[in-house]
A protein has these predicted regions:
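Aromatic- and acid-rich polysaccharide-binding/catalytic face
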Residues: 9-12, 29, 33-39, 67-68, ...
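Short amphipathic alpha-helices and their capping/turn segments at secondary-structure boundaries
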Residues: 19-24, 57-63, 123-130, 166-173
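Aromatic-rich peripheral "rim/lid" segments of glycoside hydrolase catalytic domains that contact
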Residues: 27-32, 192-195, 199-259
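Boundary/entry segment of secreted carbohydrate-active catalytic domains
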Residues: 1-16, 28
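Substrate-binding cleft of extracellular glycoside hydrolase catalytic domains
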Residues: 14, 20-119, 136, 196-198
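Well-ordered, non-membrane alpha-helical segments in soluble/globular domains
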Residues: 46-57, 87-97, 120-125, 156-166, ...
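Catalytic-core region of carbohydrate-active enzymes that cleave or remodel glycosidic bonds
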Residues: 95-103, 160-217
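Short, solvent-exposed loop/turn segments at secondary-structure junctions
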Residues: 80, 118-119, 147, 189-191
Length: 259
């Protein structure tokens, strides 16, 4: 990550010392925290949301000022419909999570973070207005669909820039949201075996140039950067590749490219 110089970083279950070391290395980066849980139940959503905020606070409070904001559950909404996903319960969980995390602990919450393209843009103001307006940030997962080999293919562009349709739907409905963060970005199949390192880097840079056009977007957290022995996500891993260097060079502050 030393070569990457990212503007947005997502840390999953960081130790306090590791998170502090990341902040020291990247003082201007926006850092999002996430606590992994294998089960994400939504029964009794209000108390569960508040309890999950309490659980996260044990790490988040010592990291106040180090990690900017924290997510709750991850990719709760999949590729089905509102009734299958229990949107009402997911909304209530997020509201309770944000109210407890922000109101009790003074730590910003990130709403959303649903599966890529899982929720119809118009359904966000319809089903999730309270969660979005309560939380200080809104997270989107942006992945080019399976079988697409570049963000810049037509179907890739539509998926990667889908956050604009979500933002437009919220605006039309009068739902206020905090800044957007693309908390995960990539190809659905992973870039390895799909692209060269140079082509993958070009895609991430292209997306950054698009995000820069929208002042309501903080930036993107690329999925992902993992240890070499991580087999589960090896097709997504950018560690030790030219992608780090090429994107890092793009992210470097110069007179021609202000940071």
């Amino acid at each position: 990550m030393d070569r990457w110089r990212p503007s947005v970083i997502l840390l999953m279950d960081p130790t306090i010392e590791f998170a502090k070391s990341v902040r020291t290395a990247y003082p201007k980066a926006f850092i999002v925290g996430r606590h992994f849980v294998a089960s994400q139940p939504l029964d009794n959503p209000g108390p569960r949301g508040a309890a999950f905020a309490d659980e996260i606070a044990s790490t988040a409070v010592p990291l106040k000022g180090i990690v900017n904001a924290w997510m709750s559950y991850n990719e709760v909404s999949g590729y089905t419909g509102p009734s299958d996903n229990n949107y009402a319960a997911w909304n209530a969980f997020q509201v309770a999570f944000a109210q407890r995390l922000q109101g009790t602990y003074g730590i910003d919450a990130v709403a959303g973070n649903d599966g890529p393209s899982a929720v119809i843009p118009g359904d966000y103001p319809k089903f999730f207005a309270p969660a979005i307006s309560t939380s200080h940030y809104f997270g989107v997962h942006a992945y080019a669909p399976i079988g697409v080999h570049s963000f810049q293919e037509p179907n890739g562009v539509a998926a990667m820039l889908r956050y604009r349709a979500i933002h437009d739907a919220l605006q039309r409905s009068g739902v206020k949201s905090g800044p957007f963060i693309l908390t995960e970005t990539g190809l659905s199949d992973g870039w390895r075996g799909q692209q060269t390192e140079e082509a993958a880097a070009a895609d991430f840079i292209w997306l950054t140039t698009e995000l820069d056009k929208d002042p309501y977007v903080v930036g993107q957290a690329v999925f992902g950067l993992f240890l070499p022995d991580n087999e589960r996500w090896k097709n997504y891993n950018v560690a030790g590749t030219l992608i780090e260097q090429i994107v890092g060079d793009y992210n470097t502050c110069t007179p021609a490219h202000a940071c």
